[in-house]
């Protein structure tokens, strides 16, 4: 039996996205810009470089108000050209 994400979450809830992308200066700004469109707020994402320095991992936490917001952000963050993966 497959459990759906919206069955596990109670809204509003704190939800963290981990975005992996190329180690370019604009990565953090692009991630925050997309998040701001769907969950306006004051964000301080954390950035961790990969061991070889080719990629950065950007973690950003929002207060999600509904499942559609969570799903839309997964999709739009993944559509950023320099992003390789969103968890």
Curated annotation (Swiss-Prot):
Coiled coil: none annotated. One of its GO terms (cellular component) is cytosol. Pfam families: DUF493 (PF04359). InterPro entries: UPF0250_YbeD-like, YbeD-like_sf. Belongs to the UPF0250 family. HAMAP family: UPF0250 (MF_00659). This is UPF0250 protein Ent638_1166. It comes from Enterobacter sp. (strain 638).
């Amino acid at each position: 039996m497959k459990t759906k994400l919206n069955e596990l979450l109670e809204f509003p809830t704190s939800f963290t996205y981990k975005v992996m992308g190329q180690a370019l200066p604009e990565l953090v700004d692009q991630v925050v810009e997309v998040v701001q469109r769907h969950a306006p707020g004051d964000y301080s994402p954390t950035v961790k470089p990969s061991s070889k320095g080719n990629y950065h991992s950007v973690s950003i936490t929002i207060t999600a108000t509904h499942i559609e917001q969570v799903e839309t952000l997964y999709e739009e963050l993944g559509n950023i050209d320099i992003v390789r993966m969103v968890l």
